[in-house]
Amino acid sequence: RATIGRGPNPLLQNHPLMAIHPPLLYMGYVGLALPFAITLGSFINETKEDWVSKSRSVARVAWVFLTIGISLGAAWSYEVLGWGGYWAWDPVENVSFIPWLLCTGFLHSSIVQRKINSLVNWNYVLIGLMFSSTIYGTFITRSGVLISVHSFSNGPIGQYLLVGLLISLISLLFVGWKNEGYFKNSKKIDSLSGKFGLFTLNNILLSIAAFIIFIGTSYPIYFEVIN
């Protein structure tokens, strides 16, 4: 048993939620790797009949973990002075919210695909973005590239995460390109006023929110690179 050492950061000792919040977020992040693996595996093995149903089943579990983890994190940060209440514009808080927004959109748009075989290509893209956003979120948290009260490490792992992010995006694009004909059979939604149209509008709003948070969070990185 260790008898000497600095111990955990004082910010991590003040609340019992610290023992629950990070593992739940981790389970949510890991859970979003499963829809990505299921989808790519289904397309590569030519078993595309029920890829969206299988992906939706595991995405729901990941969404529950993310929702509880983010909620407990908000309650925890509210009790820590200087952390901006339940939520603040902090890089690590932002990047944990992005996959939640995308996953929420997918859980709605996947219903449209199952009912009327529409938004097929959109669901494929969403699954890839959900997983990629977890890698990007881990990069922001663990690399120290952005200053955050939630960042407690700074090491070389960031470069490996960027490689993983690049590989995941290339894999998504390549497999999608190889199966281009499959996506052409997707039906189009003519109006946003019906039930399925509202589901589409829901996805548009959630995706815009995720994009705005991504750009706002990542802008300091791009600004630093350009200058």
Segments (PLM) and residue ranges:
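Polytopic transmembrane helical bundles with strong interfacial aromatic enrichment
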Residues: 1-227
